[in-house]
From Swiss-Prot:
Gene3D superfamilies: Ribosomal protein L25, beta domain, Ribosomal Protein L25, Chain P. GO terms for biological process: translation. This is one of the proteins that binds to the 5S RNA in the ribosome where it forms part of the central protuberance. Keywords: Ribonucleoprotein, Ribosomal protein, RNA-binding, rRNA-binding. It comes from Marinomonas sp. (strain MWYL1). It comes from the Bacteria. The keyword Transmembrane helix does not apply. This is Large ribosomal subunit protein bL25. HAMAP family: Ribosomal_bL25, Ribosomal_bL25_CTC.
Length: 192
Protein backbone atom coordinates (compact mmCIF):
# COMPACT_ATOMS: atom_id res chain seq x y z
CA UNK A 1 0.00 0.00 0.00
CA UNK A 2 1.44 3.36 -0.91
CA UNK A 3 0.30 6.69 0.45
CA UNK A 4 -0.74 9.63 -1.74
CA UNK A 5 -0.31 13.37 -1.36
CA UNK A 6 -0.84 16.33 -3.68
CA UNK A 7 1.77 18.99 -4.38
CA UNK A 8 2.12 22.15 -6.44
CA UNK A 9 5.08 22.96 -8.70
CA UNK A 10 6.99 26.07 -7.70
CA UNK A 11 9.23 28.33 -9.74
CA UNK A 12 10.91 30.42 -7.05
CA UNK A 13 13.79 28.84 -5.18
CA UNK A 14 16.16 29.88 -2.43
CA UNK A 15 15.99 30.84 1.22
CA UNK A 16 13.74 33.88 0.77
CA UNK A 17 11.26 32.04 -1.46
CA UNK A 18 11.14 29.11 0.97
CA UNK A 19 10.48 31.48 3.88
CA UNK A 20 7.61 33.12 1.95
CA UNK A 21 6.13 29.68 1.20
CA UNK A 22 6.24 28.70 4.88
CA UNK A 23 4.53 31.98 5.83
CA UNK A 24 1.74 31.05 3.38
CA UNK A 25 1.27 27.62 5.00
CA UNK A 26 3.28 25.69 2.43
CA UNK A 27 6.31 23.41 2.81
CA UNK A 28 9.00 23.46 0.09
CA UNK A 29 10.30 20.16 -1.27
CA UNK A 30 12.35 18.78 -4.16
CA UNK A 31 11.86 15.58 -6.19
CA UNK A 32 15.13 14.34 -7.68
CA UNK A 33 16.69 11.23 -9.19
CA UNK A 34 16.05 9.05 -12.19
CA UNK A 35 16.36 10.30 -15.74
CA UNK A 36 14.33 13.46 -15.11
CA UNK A 37 15.52 16.86 -13.90
CA UNK A 38 14.80 17.79 -10.27
CA UNK A 39 11.40 19.37 -9.66
CA UNK A 40 10.79 22.01 -6.99
CA UNK A 41 7.39 21.57 -5.36
CA UNK A 42 5.46 22.60 -2.26
CA UNK A 43 2.92 20.86 -0.02
CA UNK A 44 0.16 22.33 2.13
CA UNK A 45 1.60 22.09 5.63
CA UNK A 46 -1.58 20.64 7.19
CA UNK A 47 -1.80 17.88 4.55
CA UNK A 48 1.89 17.11 4.92
CA UNK A 49 1.65 17.00 8.72
CA UNK A 50 -1.18 14.48 8.45
CA UNK A 51 0.78 12.38 5.92
CA UNK A 52 4.01 12.43 7.97
CA UNK A 53 2.07 11.03 10.93
CA UNK A 54 0.82 8.09 8.85
CA UNK A 55 2.74 4.84 9.44
CA UNK A 56 4.97 4.03 6.48
CA UNK A 57 5.16 7.57 5.08
CA UNK A 58 8.81 8.07 6.00
CA UNK A 59 9.90 4.50 5.16
CA UNK A 60 7.71 3.42 2.24
CA UNK A 61 6.72 4.49 -1.23
CA UNK A 62 4.67 7.67 -1.52
CA UNK A 63 2.67 8.75 -4.56
CA UNK A 64 3.08 12.48 -5.15
CA UNK A 65 0.76 14.14 -7.67
CA UNK A 66 2.06 17.39 -9.15
CA UNK A 67 -0.29 19.13 -11.59
CA UNK A 68 -1.94 15.88 -12.67
CA UNK A 69 1.27 13.84 -12.98
CA UNK A 70 1.83 11.13 -10.35
CA UNK A 71 5.28 9.86 -9.36
CA UNK A 72 6.35 7.24 -6.83
CA UNK A 73 8.98 8.60 -4.45
CA UNK A 74 10.83 7.82 -1.24
CA UNK A 75 11.34 10.38 1.50
CA UNK A 76 15.13 10.81 1.66
CA UNK A 77 15.40 13.79 4.01
CA UNK A 78 13.00 15.66 6.24
CA UNK A 79 14.03 18.89 7.96
CA UNK A 80 12.09 19.99 11.03
CA UNK A 81 12.03 23.22 12.99
CA UNK A 82 14.17 22.69 16.12
CA UNK A 83 11.61 23.92 18.64
CA UNK A 84 8.19 23.44 17.02
CA UNK A 85 8.88 20.22 15.13
CA UNK A 86 7.14 21.62 12.04
CA UNK A 87 8.36 20.24 8.70
CA UNK A 88 10.57 22.88 7.06
CA UNK A 89 11.72 21.08 3.89
CA UNK A 90 11.65 17.64 2.32
CA UNK A 91 13.82 15.83 -0.22
CA UNK A 92 12.12 13.10 -2.24
CA UNK A 93 13.81 10.54 -4.50
CA UNK A 94 12.05 9.08 -7.55
CA UNK A 95 11.54 5.33 -7.48
CA UNK A 96 11.87 3.71 -10.90
CA UNK A 97 10.07 0.37 -11.28
CA UNK A 98 13.05 -1.37 -12.90
CA UNK A 99 15.81 -0.07 -10.58
CA UNK A 100 16.57 -1.31 -7.08
CA UNK A 101 16.15 1.17 -4.25
CA UNK A 102 17.88 1.29 -0.88
CA UNK A 103 15.85 2.45 2.09
CA UNK A 104 15.19 1.71 5.76
CA UNK A 105 12.22 -0.44 6.79
CA UNK A 106 10.79 -0.86 10.33
CA UNK A 107 11.41 -4.12 12.20
CA UNK A 108 8.56 -5.86 14.02
CA UNK A 109 9.36 -8.38 16.76
CA UNK A 110 6.58 -10.95 17.21
CA UNK A 111 5.83 -13.65 19.81
CA UNK A 112 8.12 -12.19 22.50
CA UNK A 113 5.62 -12.83 25.31
CA UNK A 114 5.29 -16.49 24.27
CA UNK A 115 9.04 -17.13 24.04
CA UNK A 116 10.58 -19.34 26.70
CA UNK A 117 13.11 -16.66 27.61
CA UNK A 118 10.33 -14.22 28.53
CA UNK A 119 7.43 -16.40 29.69
CA UNK A 120 9.34 -19.06 31.68
CA UNK A 121 12.80 -17.66 32.39
CA UNK A 122 11.73 -14.15 33.45
CA UNK A 123 13.56 -12.28 30.71
CA UNK A 124 12.62 -9.19 28.75
CA UNK A 125 13.03 -8.41 25.05
CA UNK A 126 15.19 -5.34 24.46
CA UNK A 127 15.12 -3.96 20.92
CA UNK A 128 18.43 -2.46 19.81
CA UNK A 129 17.48 -1.56 16.25
CA UNK A 130 14.03 -0.49 15.04
CA UNK A 131 14.98 -0.14 11.36
CA UNK A 132 16.91 -2.22 8.83
CA UNK A 133 18.34 -1.00 5.54
CA UNK A 134 17.07 -3.02 2.58
CA UNK A 135 17.64 -3.13 -1.17
CA UNK A 136 14.87 -4.19 -3.55
CA UNK A 137 12.72 -3.17 -6.48
CA UNK A 138 10.00 -0.66 -5.54
CA UNK A 139 7.27 -3.28 -6.13
CA UNK A 140 8.89 -5.58 -3.54
CA UNK A 141 9.36 -2.96 -0.81
CA UNK A 142 7.82 -4.33 2.41
CA UNK A 143 6.00 -2.08 4.88
CA UNK A 144 7.64 -3.93 7.77
CA UNK A 145 10.14 -6.75 8.31
CA UNK A 146 9.27 -9.44 10.84
CA UNK A 147 11.51 -11.11 13.41
CA UNK A 148 9.90 -14.10 15.15
CA UNK A 149 11.42 -14.45 18.63
CA UNK A 150 9.22 -17.38 19.77
CA UNK A 151 12.27 -19.64 20.21
CA UNK A 152 14.15 -17.03 22.21
CA UNK A 153 15.95 -18.10 25.37
CA UNK A 154 17.32 -15.99 28.20
CA UNK A 155 20.55 -14.18 27.15
CA UNK A 156 19.88 -14.88 23.46
CA UNK A 157 20.84 -12.24 20.90
CA UNK A 158 18.92 -11.82 17.65
CA UNK A 159 20.81 -10.65 14.56
CA UNK A 160 19.88 -9.27 11.14
CA UNK A 161 20.13 -12.81 9.79
CA UNK A 162 17.06 -13.67 11.92
CA UNK A 163 14.87 -11.24 9.95
CA UNK A 164 12.23 -12.95 7.78
CA UNK A 165 12.81 -11.51 4.30
CA UNK A 166 10.16 -11.42 1.57
CA UNK A 167 11.20 -12.58 -1.89
CA UNK A 168 13.30 -10.04 -3.77
CA UNK A 169 14.41 -8.14 -0.65
CA UNK A 170 18.03 -8.07 0.59
CA UNK A 171 19.51 -6.64 3.77
CA UNK A 172 22.27 -4.20 2.82
CA UNK A 173 24.46 -5.06 5.83
CA UNK A 174 24.40 -8.78 5.03
CA UNK A 175 25.49 -8.08 1.44
CA UNK A 176 28.78 -6.84 2.95
CA UNK A 177 29.51 -10.20 4.57
CA UNK A 178 28.76 -12.28 7.67
CA UNK A 179 30.81 -10.00 9.93
CA UNK A 180 28.16 -7.29 9.32
CA UNK A 181 25.38 -9.41 10.87
CA UNK A 182 24.70 -6.90 13.64
CA UNK A 183 22.55 -7.54 16.73
CA UNK A 184 19.03 -6.11 16.59
CA UNK A 185 17.48 -7.40 19.84
CA UNK A 186 18.19 -9.55 22.89
CA UNK A 187 16.35 -11.33 25.66
CA UNK A 188 17.98 -10.31 28.91
CA UNK A 189 17.24 -10.56 32.58
CA UNK A 190 14.40 -8.35 33.71
CA UNK A 191 15.41 -5.61 36.17
CA UNK A 192 12.42 -6.10 38.45
Amino acid sequence: MSLSINAVARTQEGKGASRRLRNEGLVPAVIYGGETAPVSISFKDNELLKAVGTPGFLTGLVEVTVEGKTEQVLVKALQRHPSTGAVMHMDLQRAQADKAITTRVPLSFINAAQSEGVSKQGGRLTVESKLAEVRCLPANLPEVLTVDVIKGQLDQIFHLSDVILPEGVELVSLLKGEDHDQPIARIGKSKR
